[in-house]
A protein has these predicted regions:
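A general structural signal for well-ordered alpha-helical segments in protein cores
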Residues: 1, 29-30, 55, 108, ...
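N-terminal Rossmann-like dinucleotide-binding module
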Residues: 1-28, 32
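Donor/substrate-binding cores of folate-linked one-carbon enzymes
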Residues: 7, 23, 69, 73-187
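Short, structured coil segments at secondary-structure junctions
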Residues: 36-37, 87
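Short beta->alpha connector loops at strand-helix junctions that form conserved
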Residues: 41-46, 94
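Glycine-rich, highly charged phosphate/nucleotide-binding loops
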Residues: 46-59
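Glycine-rich phosphate-binding loop signature in dinucleotide/nucleotide-binding domains
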Residues: 61-67
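Short, basic/aromatic-enriched C-terminal tail that caps enzymatic domains
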Residues: 181-201
């Protein structure tokens, strides 16, 4: 989240961060955002009787700010189909693997267990099928001999901090569109691939 906010300010995107909203009132990003004058809100998911009730309240909170896009960053809850469909074409997530490989949790351990030599992250539109939506961009890192899940996660985080802000800027500049076969096209950036460290692969 911080890399998105900072990139938006530093690179002077044609956009502003409307709000930062968390599912836990103690989320550290809330204080960080508030210190920078960004509106914040928190809805504690354990105070709601069901996922549907929480998602309905979350949607109502988001809609107060009338955003063009909703970007998930560190939001670890599975969203209900009703919520996802409410923001169809506007809801974006980052996942720590090169989808469609390794959906779900523990992606770095999965990558090491299967012996892949390249790992990374995927920025994608969210659909009701978990970790399955149209891919906006991907970031790649090498898997090195002796890697641990923690070491690999840190390397992936570095490429995330480049790929996600770039994808968000494309959205802000209205350069992202979906083709008839539900693939993403980005005007001016046909490759949509980030390699970290540069020239490492």
């Amino acid at each position: 989240m911080q890399s998105l906010v900072q990139s938006c300010a530093d690179q002077v995107w044609p956009a502003e961060v409307a709000a930062v909203i968390a599912s836990r009132p103690d989320a550290p990003g809330l204080e960080w955002a508030a210190e920078r004058g960004i509106p914040t809100a928190a809805l504690f998911h354990k105070e709601f009787p069901s996922r549907e009730a929480f998602d309905a309240a979350l949607a109502a909170e988001i809609d107060r700010f009338e955003p063009d896009y909703v970007l998930l960053a560190g939001f670890m809850r599975v969203l209900t189909p009703g919520f996802v469909n409410h923001y169809a074409g506007k809801l974006v997530n980052i996942h720590p693997s090169l989808l469609p490989a390794f959906p779900g949790l523990h992606t770095h351990a999965q990558a090491l267990a299967t012996g892949v030599r390249i790992h990374g992250c995927t920025i994608h539109f969210v659909t009701p099928v978990l970790d399955h939506g149209p891919i906006i961009a991907q970031g790649c890192v090498p898997v090195l001999a002796g890697d641990t899940p923690e070491a690999l996660a840190q390397r992936v985080l570095e490429v995330e901090h480049h790929a996600y802000p770039a994808a968000a800027r494309w959205l802000a500049e209205r350069r992202v569109s979906l083709t008839a076969d539900h693939r993403v096209d980005v005007q001016g950036d046909p490759n949509r691939l980030f390699i970290w460290p540069p020239a490492s692969l």
